[in-house]
């Protein structure tokens, strides 16, 4: 079993895992998509408390360390992964897919175990045929649908934040997420 990101409190993660009959200590690792705080809030806590390996690209690891974003952790718990290079955890094959987002080296994850497959793709600013191809044939897809463009534009966010969200390295709108799903 793996976690993808740890952007909520460690207590909430533990409670959620307990609800489905899993223990945090039994996790085989944490797959990190990118270094933004809403994806790594409890990464350091879980790594320290349970000795969980943290799988991330070198760019993401460097950004986490540069910001001291997760506190002091045992360096040996970091596992460098490379976009487009599959790796395994137990009997699960994991394929990191590079994504367009305003982070150091963000990825999505496609996971394959036995005859089952799942993709988790969050914080995506745009998609192209490469992304569409990677999502084909999955049994389960978790895809971000971040905002309604008109509501965002009319909302109270500062102009620069709106531009960031709407940009190619921001977040997919609900409409664009729907269009992507229609191609899968």
What are these regions (language model features)?
Residues 8-10, 37, 125-126, 147:
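Short, glycine/acidic-enriched loop or turn micro-motifs at the edges of active sites
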Residues 22-25, 46-50, 72, 134-137, ...:
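Short, conserved loop/helix-junction motifs that constitute active-site signature segments
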Residues 103, 120-129:
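Active-site glycine-rich loop that binds ribose-phosphate moieties when present
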């Amino acid at each position: 079993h793996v976690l993808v990101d740890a952007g909520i409190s460690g207590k909430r993660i533990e409670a959620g895992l307990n609800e489905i009959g899993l223990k945090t200590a039994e996790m085989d690792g944490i797959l990190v998509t990118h270094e933004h705080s809403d994806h790594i809030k409890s990464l350091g806590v879980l790594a320290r408390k349970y000795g969980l390996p943290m799988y991330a690209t070198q760019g993401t690891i460097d950004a986490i360390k540069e910001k001291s974003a997760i506190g002091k952790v045992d360096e040996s718990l970091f596992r460098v992964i490379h976009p487009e290079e599959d790796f395994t955890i137990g009997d699960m094959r994991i394929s990191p897919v590079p994504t367009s987002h305003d982070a150091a080296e963000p990825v999505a994850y496609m996971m394959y175990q036995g005859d089952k497959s799942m993709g988790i793709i969050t914080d995506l600013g745009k998609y192209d045929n490469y992304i569409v191809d990677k999502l084909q044939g999955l049994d389960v897809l978790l895809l971000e649908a971040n905002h309604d463009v008109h509501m965002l534009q009319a909302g109270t966010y500062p102009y620069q934040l709106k531009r960031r969200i709407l940009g190619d390295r921001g977040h997919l709108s609900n409409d664009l997420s729907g269009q992507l799903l229609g191609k899968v």
